[in-house]
Amino acid sequence: MTLQNDSGDEPKLAKNETIKEASNLLRGTIAEGLLDDSTGALASDDTQLTKFHGIYQQDDRDIRRERRKAKLEPAYSFMTRVRLPGGACTPQQWLDMDAFCTDYANGTLKLTTRQAFQLHGIIKKNLKLTIRKINDSLMDTVAACGDVNRNVMCNPNPNQSRLHAEALEVARAISAHLTPATRAYHEIWLEDENGEKQKITPDPEPEEEPIYGKTYLPRKFKAAVAVPPSNDVDLFANDLGFVAVIEDDEIVGYTVTVGGGMGMNHGQAKTFPRLADVLGFCTPEQVTDVAEKIVTTQRDYGDRTDRKHARLKYTIEDRGLDWFRGEVESRLGYALGQARPFEFDHNGDRYGWVDDENGNSHLTLFIQNGCVVDTDEFPM
C-alpha cells in the first residue's frame, strides 16, 4: 500500500525502512564486513540488518572513556539470540549452548523472558563460527530479533500433558511458517566442509519474501500460545495470541487475540501499553493461515513513518478492531468463528515440582536475571 498523510503527500519513512529496502533481502554488506579485520565492528546500516539474523552489535561501556582517551575504537562485541519456540531444547542442545558460551562468548548463558538463549561478548572473528556451531546443534538465530515475527512462546513444559505437547507443535508451526524466506542467512553464516555456501534450494528465481515483502514488518512482532488455566506466556501482552480451547480433553481450536504490548515512551502520549483484544476463533488447521493474514495486514497498514508508533497495537487502536477483523477475514477468504470462552487462574512461572499426566515429576528452577554462570558465590 502507499502511505499518505492528511495533506495527500507521501510521508517520510523511518530510516530503517530505507535500510531494509536497499538490503537485498537482509544481505547488505554483512559478508564483506565480516572479512574486514581493521575494525571489530560492522557498518552502521548492517547492524540494523544483523538483528534479523539474531545478532546485536554491542560494546563494553565500562571502558569506553579510557579507549576514547587512548584513541581506540570501542571494545566491540556481539550478542546472538537463539530462537527456540516454547523454549524447548534437548539435553544435548543445552550442553552445546553451555559449551558455546565458554568457547566463543563471555562465559554467561542468558535465558530470556521470551524463552530464548543469548550469548554475549562474541568478538567479530568468532561470530560466524558461533552461528555455524549453533546451527550444527539443530538450532538457529534467524528472526530472533528484527522487524519480523520473533520467538513464539508457549508453556515451558511440553511434557506436562499431551495437550501441552500439541500446543508446542502449534508454536513451532507458527514459527516455521513466519520465518523469513530469504537465503541471506544461509549464504552469510553457513558453509559446508569445503567452504562452499550452503543452499537450501537449488537457486530458485526470483528470490522473494511472500509474507514479509522486501521491507518486512514496520516493527517487531511477538506471538504466543497459551494452554488454560495457565497464562504463563502473558498472552495479552503479545501482538498475536492463540488460546487453546479444550473440550473432552482435546484441543478443538484456538481463540485468537491481537494487539497487545506493554511498551511505551514516557512523555509521548502517542505511545502506551495496551492489552490484546479477542479477535475470534480458528481451528487447529487454520492457525498458520490466520497468523499469516494478521501479519500481512500489519505489514501493509502498520506505521512505517514512526517506529515508536509502529507496533500492531497502534494499528488496531487507530483503525479499530472491527476494521482489522474485516481486513483479516477478507485475506483469509472466510470468517473467523465466534470466540470461545476461556479462563486463566494464574500467570507467571510455577516454581517447584509439577507432576505430568504420566506420573513423572518436573522441576522449575528460579534463575536470577536469567543468567546461568559459575561464580565463587554460587558455584555450578
Please tell me what each predicted stretch does:
Residues 1-380:
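Peripheral terminal and linker regions in Fe-S/redox and tRNA-modifying enzymes
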